[in-house]
Curated annotation (Swiss-Prot):
Residue ranges of every copy of the ABC transporter domain listed in the record: 679-929, 1344-1578
Disulfide bridges in this chain: C6-C26
Name under which the protein is recorded: ATP-binding cassette sub-family C member 8
Annotated Mg(2+) binding sites: S720, Q774
Reported effect, A1184E: In PNDM3; uncertain significance; slightly reduced inhibition by ATP
Topological domains, Cytoplasmic: 48-72, 124-136, 187-303, 373-438, 474-541, 593-1012, 1084-1142, 1175-1248, 1297-1581
Result after altering N1480I: In HHF1; no effect on cell membrane expression; no effect on traffic efficiency; dramatically reduced potassium channel response to activators such as MgADP or to diazoxide
Amino acid sequence: MPLAFCGSENHSAAYRVDQGVLNNGCFVDALNVVPHVFLLFITFPILFIGWGSQSSKVHIHHSTWLHFPGHNLRWILTFMLLFVLVCEIAEGILSDGVTESHHLHLYMPAGMAFMAAVTSVVYYHNIETSNFPKLLIALLVYWTLAFITKTIKFVKFLDHAIGFSQLRFCLTGLLVILYGMLLLVEVNVIRVRRYIFFKTPREVKPPEDLQDLGVRFLQPFVNLLSKGTYWWMNAFIKTAHKKPIDLRAIGKLPIAMRALTNYQRLCEAFDAQVRKDIQGTQGARAIWQALSHAFGRRLVLSSTFRILADLLGFAGPLCIFGIVDHLGKENDVFQPKTQFLGVYFVSSQEFLANAYVLAVLLFLALLLQRTFLQASYYVAIETGINLRGAIQTKIYNKIMHLSTSNLSMGEMTAGQICNLVAIDTNQLMWFFFLCPNLWAMPVQIIVGVILLYYILGVSALIGAAVIILLAPVQYFVATKLSQAQRSTLEYSNERLKQTNEMLRGIKLLKLYAWENIFRTRVETTRRKEMTSLRAFAIYTSISIFMNTAIPIAAVLITFVGHVSFFKEADFSPSVAFASLSLFHILVTPLFLLSSVVRSTVKALVSVQKLSEFLSSAEIREEQCAPHEPTPQGPASKYQAVPLRVVNRKRPAREDCRGLTGPLQSLVPSADGDADNCCVQIMGGYFTWTPDGIPTLSNITIRIPRGQLTMIVGQVGCGKSSLLLAALGEMQKVSGAVFWSSLPDSEIGEDPSPERETATDLDIRKRGPVAYASQKPWLLNATVEENIIFESPFNKQRYKMVIEACSLQPDIDILPHGDQTQIGERGINLSGGQRQRISVARALYQHANVVFLDDPFSALDIHLSDHLMQAGILELLRDDKRTVVLVTHKLQYLPHADWIIAMKDGTIQREGTLKDFQRSECQLFEHWKTLMNRQDQELEKETVTERKATEPPQGLSRAMSSRDGLLQDEEEEEEEAAESEEDDNLSSMLHQRAEIPWRACAKYLSSAGILLLSLLVFSQLLKHMVLVAIDYWLAKWTDSALTLTPAARNCSLSQECTLDQTVYAMVFTVLCSLGIVLCLVTSVTVEWTGLKVAKRLHRSLLNRIILAPMRFFETTPLGSILNRFSSDCNTIDQHIPSTLECLSRSTLLCVSALAVISYVTPVFLVALLPLAIVCYFIQKYFRVASRDLQQLDDTTQLPLLSHFAETVEGLTTIRAFRYEARFQQKLLEYTDSNNIASLFLTAANRWLEVRMEYIGACVVLIAAVTSISNSLHRELSAGLVGLGLTYALMVSNYLNWMVRNLADMELQLGAVKRIHGLLKTEAESYEGLLAPSLIPKNWPDQGKIQIQNLSVRYDSSLKPVLKHVNALIAPGQKIGICGRTGSGKSSFSLAFFRMVDTFEGHIIIDGIDIAKLPLHTLRSRLSIILQDPVLFSGTIRFNLDPERKCSDSTLWEALEIAQLKLVVKALPGGLDAIITEGGENFSQGQRQLFCLARAFVRKTSIFIMDEATASIDMATENILQKVVMTAFADRTVVTIAHRVHTILSADLVIVLKRGAILEFDKPEKLLSRKDSVFASFVRADK
């Protein structure tokens, strides 16, 4: 019909223009269409045909790269415009429906405006991405025309007295405002960019981040719609489904999010705080203020989003109330009174009374609410991640200045610092994530209670009181849960510590048959842990129970009380289901309360820890301004190292200042000797603890420049401490340390106002020192990276260093040569290899000063000689570099230019060897008896002989005799085998399997059939009862609705009351049953988790402890330990809660969809496409989430490892002056971890936004179909309310179902990995001989017969001993020697059946050891290994863990091992504590404890495998004599580290390539000129 636009009536109102065309409402509406048609006609050709030449576009790899001025405001105004236009369309449709005539002009212009608004934002987006602002002129014209036409319409409304009572008037006024603001935004773009009306446009460059192709995190740069919906993640998620995500895929962080940027922001906040605080305190309060100043704005933004989301969340209950109320009442057709040219306009009240309108408003409110909620989450987590990176960087920079005494003897450990980084920074991050709840929860509770009161009246206060009164109970449970978790963590840490010790010392445990002792030790701690876990499970189940039961209880009490005490009150479906939805909302903040309170408390504790750490003692070194001239003078060649430790807690000690004269007297003299001096200490007293007794006393020494200085002395006399004192690592009580000054280009003046000077002369900062510590410190990096150590790579120098340290054979055998990752702390290498790589690092550096702390301790004589000759002498001393060498190898003293002899922390004497010969005759003679000085020609001859006898390199260990390989043959075989398995720790294998259903089945089957049946049955029954409760509520409220009008004619009011009572009673029974089932299911889930955790850990421990030694050699220790740590923790604590959440969210979604389908079966038609979309979303998300979660974990490990490595190697890093380089690596590691965390957060938001949008669609479809059915099929209002309530439930739980599914998939990997280890075959502990047939005192003589013995480490490997025959008489002392790789250690291990004996026999005292049970065999022999192994615990436990020996026996063993005096001096004596790894004793003392441990056993056969490698020669000689006398009647087999130690043996066995080369008395072998043993002795002289 031609007149349908203005109305289909036959009268002429549409033509009436007698009062002017602008007074014709239809004409005005038609005029409003013109701007929209104009925009569509202008923009569509530009968008689809093509606009601008390609040359006018800026090509960049990101789509959205530039935001015009007012970008976010434009998007916000456009969204508001679209919403108002939707309301205008709906209002027009409703107004048009009042009369029979159709007036298209009531809603068609609004529809065109809606299309134009969408087109405008699409058009703007494309112009913005191409940076071509001139085309915005079309939008300028459009906004102008739209504003003018809409203003005309608004004015005409005013002229016809249409006001606020009509919704159309309000909407038109809003549109005028919005169009006007959009016009102003467009004018502002012209003002800023000057693309029109100005001669010179203003060019804007792309953001710096997006010019970097490596930046792929686009959240800060995309438009507002993409930010809110994470649309930019679509391509990333899609790509992740095709190929694994790695660090290259996620790229780099934007500059504003990098750790350095946030660290600078935090430092500025700290500085501002210090400026405000005159005292400059660094307490917890100052830290909180700095954090709020640096990151508070983003937190306010997150809180604003959260409050808006929570307020919008109340739209659900209100809309349910309106819809159900509309359907539950007989609504008369309303007739609006106001007309405009024959058209009726609805009022706002009439508009909101329409059920369909409410359904659409509910849909839009849900979309907006979910968007705001996810935006709040994202901003809070992003802020937390940025804060974490800033704090980690600040902690690291503090570590670089930390006093060494704090770590070695003082207040903190490396573990505490790592906990600060790994745990406390995360606590602060999660506090910032939960922080918006602190402001949002009170708002949500207050608004929720007000609305409940508005709907229910006084009854609402009953339910609210129930919830609020139970909140303290929840808090109490949460507190107990937190305590149980802390207790569990403590026991877990103790168990992991014991497991770690057990795994690191597994070789010793097996050799000593102590497996059961340490298994029992771990199981005892595990039982304590399980007790805590049981408490944790109980409180967790109570917490879960309360979360599900409190809403049921509140609803039960409220509704029953409502109908019982307020009989005239309204209990319609609208009231009931709106109240039910409000109760669910009201309970949420109270559930969060416990989490928020716990997180707040943890954050307060973490900040307190951080405050204590940041205020801990530092080593202050003056920073010198670069390129300042050096003052000339006689003392300018020296610089005093500022050793004073700044301790803010304690005043400086002055009581020891009198030990030396005034500081002026300590200035070095300006004579000729001083000119040649590199380091000089005068009157130095040094200590490790501020209040402790000086470790070094009255130290006055000089170290000559460009010469070799050796420091010698007995074990524990302070040699290593002297080096550290010179490096400034010890606390100086008094005295001064002077370093010769550096060239002007390398040093600078010190601008510090706190300069600590020894004199009035200028004090210089010392240069880098190449330092190799006694305990090798290696990075978790390649061999090459450990040697060059961030220095430029020089191939020639690198090869020279490799050759000098005899590393080439070791490199050849590694899987990837010198590019092999050697693992954290060098766990892939032997002690000797670690030592030589550490020394190689010092040799490679170009530093003028080199400190080497006992570099020969783990090396045999050949390697030591070669290192001394080719490395220290040729590479260092001949290059005129200053070398300070701490050593026990006195045979090298003739090479020293200067010797410093120490005794008991003091300097006994310093000078040349001739000086000692003249003035210290007794000491010199003592040395002479120990060293038997060798001449230069013989040393060269020995080295030449070694090279001549070396076989070709690159072969496997069993085939070659390479120098410097693993000190134990089994470790060498490990390297050979793993080379075939590609054991390069640098390559991370991606396993992208589907959901591990088998692991899930194994997990559930471990619980047992009864518990599993109870779990499944209780879960299903619980959700059936929950549905029954709500269904019965619908029937009850429907009956109340129909009863109300009938009650007027009811003769017997008792019947009505009886009917209500029946409904209330059934409702009470169902609710009570539901509460009971909630308790049963929560307890069952946690009990299942406990049972599975207990069973899997016990099986894992039993399997691992009984595994053969080959398993530990071919499986990385970290991998095994991870099964006991992270995987067991996942099974203990995470899988049960995830399983409960997954089952609950899945069953809730299924039951909700079932209820909706029951209420409106037509919903099933719409459900199918939504289900397909949901399936693909979860499918893509799970793959990306799994990869990102693994990437987040794997990027965190290097970060934590870097912290641990830095703390352990702090002395080395500071000695090298590499602080800045390590800080840069820290920033890289932090950024890598943060970018993975941010992508994971964005992926989670991507999922949740989509799933919640799908949930909103479910709500819309359910609402529309329910309303339609109710209007046409007489569907009861109660069922409509039921369907809508469950539709809201779907929108809440759908994303949790997918998230929990992804989490469960990831966590079941722990079960899969543990079950993989459970397949490991155990050693065959059973023997052919029954225990009763073995004499109790066997072996009582010590006679050993070796018959044609051939052994190998695995059936797939070649033999390491071939056809060995020997006869050892009882009580004989046998020495075994041979070059590295000759089979010495394999020979000793064969006695314990630690290797595969595939041919021959070993018969001890008439019994073939192959027939003995393993435990019996190993418990009857004794061995001492080269690497000392001590366990945390008492000295008594370390010597006698079986508790079989008396104290006198233990003291006797300590006396034999030269440790009796040391132990007696300790508090507690035998009960004194040995720390983990024996770190509170020196390396030599640890070895002596191992000797004492072997002496305690008093077996007839005693094997020493290079047991004295870490002991000085004097102590070694004493021990050898003691062994010979104390074990005169026992058979002793000694594998020689120094050949001279076996000269007194009865027989000597010389091995070569696994075969006996020589076997005779030592004097006979020495008498033969061609004897290999004789050549060894000559080389050892």
